[in-house]
A protein has these predicted regions:
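Nucleotide-activated chemistry modules centered on ATP-dependent adenylation/adenylyltransferase
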Residues: 2-94, 109, 113-434
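Contiguous, well-ordered alpha-helical segments that form the cores/surfaces of helical PPI scaffolds
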Residues: 104-108
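Short, glycine-rich nucleotide/cofactor-binding loops
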Residues: 93-103
Length: 434
């Protein structure tokens, strides 16, 4: 487990995780309860609680972004990282990066504001877009940092994908496992005691913690939230075709490996009022970060590096939860006051209809099926197996798109063609011309 600060009382991490089961099962068998402010309800996978007025825990925690003294919290961050400067060799910290605009913000803060010398690490999704490839190279070039890239064998990656799709109905697990463990392995191997992440998704969406808790990444939170309680070791159980040595990349370091490393993983969002949209747009303007239209949403910054996330993964999310990634984006925008709840409802309905009428990203799903060597029928069978048979959706009529909604959607930067125009995945590609 990554080291966390010790207190004399129950640590925030433990306090939050004690109620994991209760939160995760909260909506099961209960009447549907929707937040009075955002679009989330009590079926949220991270779990939501509601106050007496019907406001969800995610909205309550988000309110801290306007109530906390963030200048003071930045000072706390500066004090926190000071002991790590030059303490163990060349690198002060490890930073996991992806090819999206907000990772420019992470580097801008860590290197330009805090004065740390980071080692960048990036785990290859195998589904890279040209936009993502270009952003990743631009990050390395702009901030003049060393970077370690981890690319698994395509054959092994596909074997892991088949296992997680058949066992958990997930196409995102292989990347999440690698993305969350590769930085820890590098930190242990290179004796770098600090890992810096942008934000903690359960806190940003469902208010799992207060920013005052200053929660840190641990093995347990990764297991519960990122990996759906399914570890790399589970991949080789039963009738799996995978061998032990093929899943080592996805396995968390052992307690013995971690014992002497004293590695901790912190989230910048505990010290900065994290706003993915605002920060991304600042980075587009300041450093030339790239943005592109994604299927299924108006957001041109989130996961523009991954052709499967906003297509196949989004289709699975809709099947499993009844809503797509666009709801996450809309809830964020409601909370920041950039769209009204009524307009968000209308916009979500329009995307739901578009998803239904286009066959649920059928072109992009077929691209994935061809890559993995499976049929659409086999995929649908797995969806039925994991999430129940799909019934015909009854969609409420989408409201006519108003000029205000059109302006809202067009307010997002577009510096490259839509990622859906790309006809093949890039494993390793050329990002910059020199």
């Amino acid at each position: 487990m990554l080291a966390t600060k010790q207190t004399s009382t129950l640590a925030p991490e433990a306090a939050g995780l004690q109620s994991i089961a209760a939160r995760a099962t909260q909506g099961i068998g209960q009447p549907l309860q929707q937040c009075r402010a955002c679009l989330y309800d009590n079926r949220h996978p991270f779990g939501l609680t509601f106050d007496d007025t019907g406001l969800c825990s995610g909205c309550t925690t988000h309110a801290e972004k306007t109530s906390l003294d963030w200048a003071a919290r930045l000072g706390m961050l500066e004090k926190l990282v000071q002991p790590y400067k030059g303490c163990k060799g060349n690198y002060d910290c490890v930073i996991p990066v992806r090819g999206t605009a907000e990772y420019f913000k992470v580097l801008d803060v860590v290197k330009n504001q805090l004065g740390l010398n980071p080692l960048l690490v990036s785990f290859n999704s195998h589904f890279n877009s040209q936009t993502g490839i270009q952003n990743l190279d631009l990050i390395r070039d702009t901030f003049d940092c060393d970077i370690l890239l981890k690319t698994q064998s395509p054959t092994v990656y596909k074997k892991i994908m088949r296992e997680t799709l058949s066992r958990r109905g997930s196409v995102h697990w292989p990347f999440l496992a690698g993305h969350t463990v590769w930085p820890v392995r590098v930190a242990v191997q290179h004796d770098i005691p600090l890992i810096i992440w942008p934000f903690h998704q359960p806190t940003e969406q469902s208010g799992m913690f207060s920013y005052l808790d200053e929660n840190e990444m641990t093995r347990r939170s990764r297991h519960e939230y990122d990996l759906m309680q399914f570890e790399a070791e589970d991949l080789v159980s039963g009738e799996s075709l995978l061998r032990d040595e093929e899943v080592l990349t996805s396995a968390y370091p052992s307690d013995r490996e971690l014992a002497g490393a004293s590695v901790r993983g912190i989230y910048l969002a505990n010290y900065l009022p994290w706003d993915t949209r605002q920060y991304s747009e600042e980075m587009v303007s300041k450093f030339g970060a790239q943005a592109a239209e994604c299927p299924g949403t108006f957001d041109t910054y989130d996961h523009v590096d991954n052709l499967v996330y906003m297509s196949v993964h989004d289709a699975i999310k809709r099947r499993k939860l009844g809503y797509g990634r666009v709801r996450d984006h809309l809830c964020r925008e409601i909370r920041f006051g950039r769209i009204s709840r009524d307009d968000a409802v209308a916009l979500e309905a329009s995307y739901a209809k578009a998803f239904a009428y286009t066959g649920g990203h059928s072109k992009l799903k077929q691209q994935f099926f061809d890559w993995l060597g499976m049929t659409a029928q086999a995929f649908e069978w797995l969806m039925d197996y994991h999430f129940g048979r799909l019934h015909q959706l009854t969609l409420s009529p989408a409201l006519a798109t108003t000029s205000a909604l059109s302006a809202f959607q067009e307010g997002y930067e577009r510096t490259r063609p839509p990622i859906a125009d790309q006809d093949k995945y890039i494993i390793i590609g050329k990002g910059l011309s020199v």
